[in-house]
Amino acid sequence: MKRFILIFVGLLCFTLLSALPAYSDSLLQKAKSGDAEAQYYIGRAYYDGNGVKKDYNQAFQWFKSAAEKGITEAQYWMGNCYYEGKGTKQDYNEAFSWYKPAAEQGLPEAQYSLGNCYYEGRGTKQDYIEAFRWFKAAAEQGLPVAQYLVGNCYYEGIGTKQDYNEAFRWFKAAAEQGDAKAQNNLGDCYYYGEGVNEDDNEAFKWYKAAAEQGDAKAQYNLGDCYYYGEGVNEDDNEAFRWYKAAAEQGLADAQNRLGNCYYIGKGVKQDYNEAFRWYKAAAEQGDAGLQYCLGWLYYIGEGIKQDYNEAFRWFKAAAEQGLPVAQYRLGDCYYYGKGVRQDYNEAFRWYKAAAEQGDAYAQYCLGFCYANGAGVKQDYNEAFRWFKAAAEQGDVDAQCRLGDCYYYGKGVRQDYNEAFRWFKAAAEQGDAYAQYSIGFCYANGEGVRKDDNEAFRWYKAAAEQGYAGAQYNLGVCYSKGKGVRQDYNEAFRWFKAAAEQGIAEAQYNLGFYYYYGKGVKQDYNEAFRWFKAAAEQGIADAQYALGLFYDYGNGVYQDFKEAYYWYLISYRNGYTDAEQDVKRIEDILTYQQKQEVQERVNEWFKTHPKE
């Protein structure tokens, strides 16, 4: 296992955007009147695009006004502007001159940045001792990246005497705050017994924490742990997985290890490079099957760097010899514009060539073209015909689409029984959409006798595969006790899963559960967050709920204008119970306030048209 020490340099933007006031006319007036704090906030608003269009030039000018009045944070941001050349010409000397006063006033971000200037010799003479001093000042205030750098300085003896015990202490402080590089180096300390007793289990734990955050060196080290069985049971598959993750980030040692895995067949099938070499030799002699294989290797980047242009070239060579699988892959290239300019007409032509030879996937694709009018005039009858041909060969996607055709009466007379039959065929092959559809049929008695227990079973199968609609419906089953014993905890769990995938109804239900503490500890802040997500997607009940939040100050500051805004949107969206609240709030607001809100509401409906 190899040691990796890296000094991280660059601009850090630590202040959370949510903690700062957004741009507003009142804030701007304060700033123009000379209020230094307001000037800084206006600068940040322009810098971050918080309530106003990003404008680094404006940000720089407002930071300058505030910085010259002694606002520490503004001095730090002046340093950032000069360091990055944002809003002004890049000038490390000026960056250094602004970081310094902010650092001397105790701002940890500025202390880190000043240390970085000394470390890199930017804007000042390179001085590792000063760099260490300022990194340490920031680290002692809890800044994770500074703690990591102090650990590195102690480890390497940069700017201070080498001290593995201190290195360990600072790596641990940063690692416990989630810094991935520190977690990796802490793993190294445990692995090599530097500054702490050697402990492979602890080394594995910290490598894994960093690897799961995407740190390439930790992924490589974790691969070694699995490969050699250090701190964990030996597992070639896991070793391969982590080497691959690191290799795909460009880490040379991991790429070498990954090559070894392919070469000797550890954790992966043996010999992709050799396979590629022989495919190429045969393909160049005109064998259609091997031309296709070579094209596929280029297409998926297996054993060779991914190259859609080369994939297209080899698919075309094989397709022109009449190979169906190459013809439909060539169709894919044209359809998605991979290796060639997107061309639905050509995609349709090649799908048709393969479909007429009986290739099931091509038949499905041809049906898809007819259904969507891609490369051919839309024709549901033809779509149905080709979906059926593919479905009868067992193509799961075609079975799903054939089920849809029967369910909605597209290209064929509506027939819930047939829809159910084809959904079931696909569901039994494990397709999540089909499992969801089967559940829906059982829940509504469409094509089959209504059966809540079966509906629940199929929703669960689809939900466990991550299908969002099924996760929502499963939540409903648990919430209402349909097909399963009522269980608010499980209902909450599945609503949350669906909500996080963007299902508006699930977001509303999740907000409801947080609001009333059903299946989860009551939390108005979380309730507000999820109601807002649902409201933005047009759920009128959620819009009304937001109005209540702002009206009564639950989980958010009381704000009658915002309450009026959401009440009015919900009312115009069909939530008639909001009418009395709209009228009540109108009596509270001024004429100008009402006009402002009504204009905002009109804008909302322009960007959120009713379906």
Question: What is the predicted role of each segment?
Answer:
Residues K32-D35, Y46-N50, D55, F63, ...:
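Short helix-capping/linker turns of helical repeat alpha-solenoids
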Residues Y41-D48, W77-E84, N116-E120, L149-E156, ...:
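Hydrophobic face of amphipathic alpha-helices that form TPR/SEL1-like repeat modules
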Residues I7-S18:
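Bacterial N-terminal signal peptides
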Residues M1-F4:
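Positively charged n-region of N-terminal signal peptides that target proteins for export
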Residues A45, A66, C81, A102, ...:
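TPR/TPR-like alpha-solenoid repeats
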Residues D577-E611:
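Terminal, low-structured helical/coil segments at or just beyond the last alpha-helical repeat
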